[in-house]
């Protein structure tokens, strides 16, 4: 089992990779009952939406579903389960709104489900298309 320090080092390494992505990067636990909690959010993800890390965590209670516009939940969640993941990967991006500090931003998102140590996660990118 990995320690918190090992996980932290892994996320720091991930941040170095995420800095090379033109959009924002996020990773969520595959836990729909708890709103798909964020395991990781890149600095660029926060920058696109205008949030500081501390206010983002407080505002959304670390839940992906709290960030998605209520009318867009179907689009924002369509790839977030094992049954849809393979189909989603073949069909391309999803377009929906995420709540930014100054209002909703339209984003294009590409994501896939991965397993890590037996747990399911959704990893994805967002690009601002507002």
Where do the PLM segments sit?
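PAS/PAC or PAS-like capping segment
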Residues: 71, 128-130
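PAS/PAS-like sensory domains
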Residues: 20-24, 74, 82-94
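Short coil/loop residues immediately preceding or within conserved phosphate-binding loops
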Residues: 36, 91-93, 104, 121
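PAS-family sensory/regulatory domains
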Residues: 57-73
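Short, charged amphipathic alpha-helical "coupling" segments at sensory-output junctions
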Residues: 1-13
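PAS-family sensory domains
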Residues: 30-32, 95-103
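PAS-family sensory domain signal
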Residues: 10-62
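Short loop/turn elements at sensory-signaling interfaces that couple input to output
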Residues: 104, 109-124, 128
